[in-house]
């Protein structure tokens, strides 16, 4: 089997010895190996990481409004354990895998370069690696600026609604970007209705209901 240190990139073989790809290994994790590539001969270096970042961004450009979106989504982009959300000109990073720790700042730098090629300048990067899942990887919680400090309240617009996102104190990376199309659906189904948005974090569903000329809306956080 060979020797390794938790977090190393290793080649994965099947029972017959056939190479299946490469990934991070961590004996302390319930996910023993997180796959980076299915090509065992592929070098995991800066060129590889840039390709992954570039592919992720190009895909987002063809599928979503990129003003605020999840640019890198872990395993879905073959960058396991890493999430990067873009809020206008701010990036928020969440790293949940030991193996990705060694590459996260390089990936952020590469992503800023890829965005710059499209005329997008990033004014700041904040890390929100403060989820409990980090402990399962043998990692401490981390929360703070990557690089220079900046104003961490970011104004975004989604589905015609304006929000002020607090990337330091907001839940997850500051905002639930994955609920975008559910919020948009509220504008259609709530027209002319009375709406109560219960157990809300930012009142986003109530705001989207309110944009469609409903009779009344209210929101409660508990």
Label each region the model flagged.
Residues 215-221:
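Conserved small/polar residues in nucleotide/adenosyl-binding loops
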Residues 178-191:
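Conserved alpha-helix/loop element of class I SAM-dependent methyltransferases that forms part
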Residues 6, 191-192:
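Short, flexible surface segments
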Residues 1-88:
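Non-catalytic accessory regions of SAM-dependent methyltransferases
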Residues 193-199:
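Conserved class I S-adenosyl-L-methionine
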Residues 74-85, 104-175:
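Non-catalytic substrate-recognition/targeting regions of SAM-dependent transferases
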Residues 204-213:
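Conserved SAM-binding loop of SAM-dependent methyltransferases across substrates and taxa
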Residues 69, 192-193:
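Nucleotide donor/acceptor-binding cores
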């Amino acid at each position: 089997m060979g020797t390794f240190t938790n977090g190393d990139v290793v080649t994965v073989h099947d029972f017959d010895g056939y190479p299946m790809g490469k990934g991070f290994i961590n004996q302390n994790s319930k996910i023993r190996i997180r796959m980076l590539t299915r090509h065992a001969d592929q070098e995991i270096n800066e060129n590889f990481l840039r390709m992954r970042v570039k592919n992720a961004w190009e895909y987002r450009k063809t599928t979503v409004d990129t003003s605020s979106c999840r640019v890198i989504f872990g395993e879905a982009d073959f960058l396991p354990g890493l999430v990067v959300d873009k809020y206008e000109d701010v990036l928020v990073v969440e790293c949940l895998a030991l193996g990705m720790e060694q590459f996260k700042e390089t990936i952020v730098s590469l992503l800023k370069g890829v965005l710059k090629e499209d005329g997008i300048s990033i004014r700041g990067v904040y890390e929100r690696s403060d989820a409990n899942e980090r402990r399962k990887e043998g990692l401490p919680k981390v929360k703070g600026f990557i690089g220079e400090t900046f104003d961490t309240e970011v104004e975004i617009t989604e589905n015609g609604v304006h929000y002020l996102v607090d990337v330091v104190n907001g839940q997850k990376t500051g905002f639930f970007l994955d609920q975008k199309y559910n919020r948009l659906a509220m504008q259609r189904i709530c027209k002319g209705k009375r709406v109560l948005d219960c157990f809300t974090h930012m009142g986003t569903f109530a705001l989207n209901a309110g944009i469609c000329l409903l009779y009344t809306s209210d929101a409660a956080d508990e």
